[in-house]
Each structure stands twice: as structure tokens, then as C-alpha cells.
Amino acid sequence: MQPSIRSYLRTGPGYVYAAHSGTARETGRIACLASNENPFPPSEAAIAAGAAALATVNRYPDDRMTDLTEALKRLHGDHTFVVGNGMDGIIETVLRCFIGHGDRVVVSTPTFSFYGIAAAGQGAIVENIQRKEDFTVDIPAFTRACTGAKVAFLCTPNNPTGTVTTPAEVRKVLDGIGDCMLFLDNAYVDFARDDYRPLMGEYENLIIGRTMSKIFGLAGLRVGYAFIPAWLEPFYMKAATPFSGISSVSAAAAVAALADREHRERTLAHMLEWRERVRSAVRFPVLPSEANFLMIDVAPHTADDVVATLAGRGVLIRSCRSFPGLGDHYVRVSIGDAWENERFIEEINRI
């Protein structure tokens, strides 16, 4: 007899992955624009540092990731940082700190689906608060919903819409949610105009999550980190599984990547230029975005049909049908290298 699986795994949604390049390999070179990745290799210094760290992988990594957290302080200021296996790992640990069976978690949707999936895994009741028609956050509705909730998730720039919630709006939320912990997902903030770091010194119920998968190009190394209130750190470390941060190879590469300002600025300049060029060249309506991707309304076509058609032509993009509240007509495309972007423009305009 098979042991009983938890009901949320039987009935709830799982995370839907974007298409991988192997799904269209037979077409030749692939334009991989489905996963909001950096199209360029990481910093040469990061590659060298990661390779050098392989010599000591017989030893466990520093559980506090001291070298990396000190590098983060040099870049961001003297805050308290934790490091995790992608931001996903940090999200799960934060939820273990606060959530018990039946506790409420609030999510501003449509957004990154893992918030709700991870919260359900902790036994939470997940309340999705729909964004407005322009996909900006309904601040009053979101703030009201947070009353009595344990944790709330807000992504800015938002995945998959690219829309932003300004620091002033985030402050309004924080001023109105009492002791609810707000997890502010800043995965794409390097491509945006606003800076949310000044909020960290003002609120004891704010966590700001960030990643090195995007502008730093370390997606395959799974380096996430977060600014957390100092009071939370000992509880976070208790909730984390042993050595649940990142590998010593990933940590060494991350420290070197943080120091390579030229690589970061070169990537940003490319992304900002091509984000506008792609937006203006596509014949379908494109939402304003401050991320490294664009969301496009392909109606009257369905998102799945457009994604399948482009995949057959060697261009991989993401259907947004799996994001609750988005319907069947939106696709998301990452900003790639020049060749990838030109291929996408050519093929989407043939639809």
C-alpha cells in the first residue's frame, strides 16, 4: 500500500517551467527567451573564482556565507543579509519562520506563482488579491487583505507583467499592515529606476529578496539573497536546513561577480536599449516594463498557440496562461542578445 500524499500536492498546482532550449534543438540555434535569463556569460572573474573554489569542495561551505555577506554589505550598505539556494530557498525558509497550518498569506496577483505554492506547502490559506486592469497593485485592497495575515508577497518589478510598485506605495502598504511580514521580491530591480533599500532601516516587518540570476548571469549557480531585519536572523538560521545556503563554488563566483561593476553596467546598458527596441518593434500591444522582459497581448491568438508556433521556428518564449488571473492571451519574452531579439521580432510579427 502506498503511503498517503498530502492533499495539496494531489489537488494544488505545481510550478510551471518555461520551455528549455532542448525542446527545439532540431531547428538549429535557439533564441532562448522564455526564462528571463541573462543572455551573456557571467563575469570572467566570477568564472575564474568559481573554478578555483572547486579545489576545496571536499569541505562544507561556511553556513553563514561570511565572504558573500560582507561583499553584499560593501555593495548595499551595512544591513543584515541571508543567502539561499535561489530566492525560492529563502522564501521557503521565511515561510517556515512564520507560517503554521491555517495561517493566512496574501499575494498580489498575477505574479510569480511560487509564493502561493510554497505557502500552501506550509499549510497556509493563500489569499490572492487581483491587480488593477493596468496590472499595478490595488494598494488599498492589498493593504486591507494583509490585516491579520502572517506574510504578504509583493513583486516589483512584477513577474510576468513588468509593472512596478513605487517605494512610496510600498511605504503605504507597510504603514497599514501592522505586524504582517512583507516579502518584497526585487529580483528584477537592477533593470528598474527605483531603489527600495532605504526602506530597510525603517521597518521591522520588511524582507527584500534579490537574486544573482539576472543581471549577474549566475542563474545556473542558484544564488539568492535577502535583506532581513536584524531581529529575524537567529530565527531564520534556526528554520534553515543545514548548509542550505549555496555551494562554496557558487559563493566564490558570486563574490567576484559583485565586484565586477563593468560587467554589470555593460549588461544593463544592453538590456535597457533592447527592451525599448523590442517594445517599439512588436506589432502587438506591449505592457510598459521595468524588468528584463516584456509581456505582450497576442489576442485574438492564444498564448499557447503563439508559443508553440514560435518554438517550431526556434524561438522560445513563455505563455502566461499558468499565471492566475491573466487569461489565455498574454506571452512573456525575455530580452536576449541582439540576434535573439531580432529573431523574436521577425517571428512574432509573422503571427
UniProtKB/Swiss-Prot annotation:
Record bears the keyword Acyltransferase: no
Biological or metabolic pathway of the protein: Amino-acid biosynthesis; L-histidine biosynthesis; L-histidine from 5-phospho-alpha-D-ribose 1-diphosphate: step 7/9
Superkingdom classification of source: Archaea
Any GO BP: L-histidine biosynthetic process
InterPro entries: Aminotransferase_I/II_large, HisP_aminotrans, HistidinolP_aminotransfase, PyrdxlP-dep_Trfase, PyrdxlP-dep_Trfase_major, PyrdxlP-dep_Trfase_small
UniProt-listed Enzyme Commission number(s): 2.6.1.9
Cofactors required: pyridoxal 5'-phosphate
Pfam family, one: Aminotran_1_2
Gene Ontology MF terms: histidinol-phosphate transaminase activity; pyridoxal phosphate binding
Keyword field: Amino-acid biosynthesis, Aminotransferase, Histidine biosynthesis, Pyridoxal phosphate, Transferase
Catalytic reactions on record: L-histidinol phosphate + 2-oxoglutarate = 3-(imidazol-4-yl)-2-oxopropyl phosphate + L-glutamate
Residues where N6-(pyridoxal phosphate)lysine is found: K214
Matching HAMAP family: HisC_aminotrans_2 (MF_01023)
Similarity section: Belongs to the class-II pyridoxal-phosphate-dependent aminotransferase family. Histidinol-phosphate aminotransferase subfamily.
Stated name of the protein: Histidinol-phosphate aminotransferase
Species of provenance: Methanosphaerula palustris (strain ATCC BAA-1556 / DSM 19958 / E1-9c)
